[in-house]
A protein has these predicted regions:
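Alpha-helical transmembrane segments of multi-pass membrane proteins
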Residues: 67-72, 108-113, 121, 125-153, ...
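Alpha-helical transmembrane segments of multi-pass membrane transporters/permeases
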Residues: 153-179, 390-412
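Hydrophobic faces of transmembrane alpha-helices in multi-pass small-molecule transporters and flippases
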Residues: 20-36, 163, 221-248, 333-342
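Specific pore-lining/lateral-gate transmembrane helices of multi-pass inner-membrane transport
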Residues: 92-104, 273-357
Length: 493
């Protein structure tokens, strides 16, 4: 990601409003692509449905289906995302580009089999019609491939291609939805769901074409990445727990007193969901700042510090490099927190004016949720930035512990808040995000207080190779692929 930051930094140096907008567009899409695309499509769908005069129950069911599909796909990919990214980084560092495409299809296949099986079972009993269920499953499969492809696309630094695929997906979804629903009078639910599916499908094809343009095809095993899942299992659970903490409060509200049964197993809480989606956009500034400022300024000091250990630097130089690195880190984290505080305060001050421009029907309760969740998402954004720094220092244990605290506290406190007045529903997530921020902050402070010991004393004397269930699964799949069939044996004889 630091390499991405350096490339984006070049764009920010260019003069002019258009250059700045393009740089922020690249950074925003790269950092928060999946959720940003989902939020924009949700808001656009609501606007199109209101223009077409669609019944409220159809709008609610459409939003529920897309939201369920989005959150389920992000949950499945969250477990594999960090280990796959680590595998990708290692292979690029070792100049093993021939392993990239096989690992992409291997990881995508693994997530598709697991995710489509579970989500397909849910759709069978959800109350959706056959056509609606097939469209949801189709959309889910496209999202899995798209979210996985984002990790690989950032490696090739083709930000224009990423931006174009992103914009093309939105344009096709909105344009096709307008034609089908508004002009041709197709059923709102099926027409809009098909349009969104086509939009994500275009993005998927575009991204895969980009990958094939940059990485060579080969006969390498597509399951080699599974060894990295075993070796970096804390990374997998860090991603999963962070995802649970980020989205569990939505699901709990659906099942709570404010939840509404839209159809079958599809529940929603419109008064809570819409403010949550819009409040999520306020963390964009911190996500962008982390890549283009924190990492760009911190990484050279970080690299210099660790190179002194690898290249036999003297103690005095190591101590000086450590002081410089931590000074830059503290400064950048402080600036990040201040920027997020400024954005949150500005949004809270202008929210009545800004939200009045959108035909979303905000009432006093929704305004309260929006303010509460803006603060919660702001704390999460800063805490997540510190979590990334813990991963820089390979404090995987501290990172997974902080993510687990976030998942348990945000989920548990939101569940407890269901017994309170509806005005307090967002406070469970806010307190969970605050705990997440405090745990990551204290853990980073404790970890860096004795950094030389962490670098040298906690490393294993002998290199360890972890061969767990995922490694054995990879070997099994690799062996099964190479095993000749009976017909092949007969023809050979």
């Amino acid at each position: 990601m630091a390499g991405i930051g350096f490339e984006l930094k070049k764009l920010f140096r260019r003069k002019g409003l258009f250059a700045s907008l393009r740089a922020y567009g690249y950074a925003g899409i790269i950092c928060t692509g999946p959720m940003l695309l989902g939020v924009l499509l949700q808001l656009g769908i609501l606007l199109l449905c209101s223009w077409s005069g669609a019944p409220r129950d159809q709008q609610d069911l459409l939003v529920c289906m897309i939201t369920y599909t989005l959150l389920f796909s992000l949950t499945v990919t969250s477990f594999f995302s960090m280990p796959v990214t680590r595998y990708l980084a290692d292979m690029l560092y070792e100049e093993q580009e021939q392993t990239i495409l096989p690992s992409f299809w291997g990881s995508s296949s693994m997530m598709l089999v697991l995710g489509c099986t579970l989500y397909g079972l849910f759709l069978l009993v959800s109350g959706a019609t056959l056509l609606q269920g097939l469209l949801c499953l189709w959309l889910f499969a496209e999202m899995i491939v798209n979210w996985n492809a984002m990790s690989y696309l950032t490696a090739i630094k083709d930000y224009r291609g990423i931006l174009c695929s992103f914009l093309a997906a939105i344009a096709l979804a909105f344009g096709l939805g307008f034609v089908l629903v508004v002009l041709l009078g197709c059923p709102v639910l099926e027409g809009m769901l098909f349009a969104v599916t086509m939009g994500y499908g275009l993005m998927m094809v575009w991204d895969v074409v980009l990958l094939y343009r940059y990485f060579p095809q080969s006969e390498e095993s597509p399951w080699a990445f599974l060894r990295w899942v075993d070796a970096f299992l804390p990374l997998a659970f860090t991603g999963l727990c962070t995802n649970i903490g980020l989205f569990a409060h939505l699901v709990i509200c659906w099942a709570g007193p404010s939840g509404v049964q839209v159809k079958g197993l599809f529940y929603g809480a419109p008064y809570y969901d819409v403010p949550a989606l819009i409040a999520f956009l306020t963390i964009l500034v911190t996500s962008v700042n982390f890549v283009v400022s924190v990492e760009v300024n911190f990484y050279p000091k970080y690299r210099n510090y660790y190179s002194l250990f690898n290249d036999g630097g003297v103690v005095g130089d190591i101590v000086t490099a450590e002081e410089e690195m931590l000074a830059v880190l503290n400064r950048e984290l402080r600036f990040t927190a201040l920027k997020q505080l400024f954005v949150t305060a500005a949004v809270l001050s202008l929210e009545n004016t800004l939200l009045a421009l959108l035909p979303l029907g905000f009432n006093d309760l929704m305004h309260g949720y929006f303010r509460t969740l803006c603060v919660g998402y702001g704390l999460y954004a800063v805490g997540n930035t510190i979590l990334m720094i813990l991963l820089y220092f390979t404090d995987y244990g501290g990172a997974v512990a902080a993510a687990a605290v976030f998942a348990v506290s945000a989920s548990g406190l939101t569940a407890l808040s269901m017994a309170l007045d509806p005005a307090f529903y967002g406070f469970g997530f806010l307190i969970g995000a605050a705990l997440f921020y405090l745990v990551t902050l204290f853990r980073l402070d404790a970890f860096t207080a004795n950094l030389p010991y962490r670098v040298l004393g906690q490393q294993p004397i002998v290199a360890e190779t972890k061969a767990g269930r995922f490694t054995r699964l990879g070997l099994f799949l690799k062996h099964k692929k190479r095993k000749p069939t009976k017909s092949a044996k007969h023809s050979a004889s």
